[in-house]
Amino acid sequence: MEPFIKHKGLVAPLDRANVDTDAIIPKQFLKSIRRTGFGPFLFDEWRYLDEGQPDMDCSQRPVNPDFVLNQARYQGASILLTRRNFGCGSSREHAPWALKDFGFRAIIAPSFADIFYNNCFKNGLLPLVLTEAQVDRLFKEVEAAPGYELEIDLPEQQVRTPAGEAFEFEIDGFRKHALLEGLDEIGLTLQHAEDIRAYEARRREQAPWLFTDLEEGR
């Protein structure tokens, strides 16, 4: 995964609460487990005027001009600002895959659904919790200023506005470490590869019968 240290990017405001995973990436796109290629179908039922299907050429589809991500001022946005309980509904890791593939590096909201929140960290996407009052204020500033950007400083755990104001946010230390180092669960495990090999060597000496079938099956 790409490390997340500091990120400055354009903010897109999705002014909706309780956005569920079926809205983020509809069920017909869940057959693939490639992790990539979902960006064009992010918020599919809101972005387009027709019904999306896997492998469609989205460049030829009629778009909904009123949807925020179709508006010219938010093209290239990498930070999504939204409302409480984002990512609720059924569990599907495709939701953070679609957000990441679209180009988002972080999502700011007052709260997230637990499973979605956990899945974001596993895929290098930062779900960042601010207070309702702070989110309300950011919505007003984003809508009033085209080209509005925020800077997210993960080491300092701060969100900085164009005016220089800083909002503090909390994050679990282990998850912070994984994002800073760009490590997913496999990468974190491989950091302990030497310890794992040493443990296996000790176990092979202490209980060789446990490894007999493995050796015979080589």
Swiss-Prot record:
Functional description taken from the UniProt entry: Catalyzes the isomerization between 2-isopropylmalate and 3-isopropylmalate, via the formation of 2-isopropylmaleate.
GO cellular component terms, semicolon-separated: 3-isopropylmalate dehydratase complex
HAMAP family: LeuD_type1
Keyword hit for Hydrolase: no
Protein name (database record): 3-isopropylmalate dehydratase small subunit
Pfam family, one: Aconitase_C
Subunit field text: Heterodimer of LeuC and LeuD.
EC number, UniProt record: 4.2.1.33
A biological process from GO: L-leucine biosynthetic process
InterPro entries: 3-IsopropMal_deHydase_ssu, Aconitase/3IPM_dehydase_swvl, AconitaseA/IPMdHydase_ssu_swvl, IPMI_Swivel, LeuD
Substrates-to-products reaction catalysed: (2R,3S)-3-isopropylmalate = (2S)-2-isopropylmalate
Statement: the UniProt record of this protein carries the keyword Lyase: yes
Keyword terms: Amino-acid biosynthesis, Branched-chain amino acid biosynthesis, Leucine biosynthesis, Lyase
Family of the protein in this entry: Belongs to the LeuD family. LeuD type 1 subfamily.
Pathway membership, UniProt: Amino-acid biosynthesis; L-leucine biosynthesis; L-leucine from 3-methyl-2-oxobutanoate: step 2/4
Species of origin: Alkalilimnicola ehrlichii (strain ATCC BAA-1101 / DSM 17681 / MLHE-1)
Gene Ontology MF terms in the entry: 3-isopropylmalate dehydratase activity
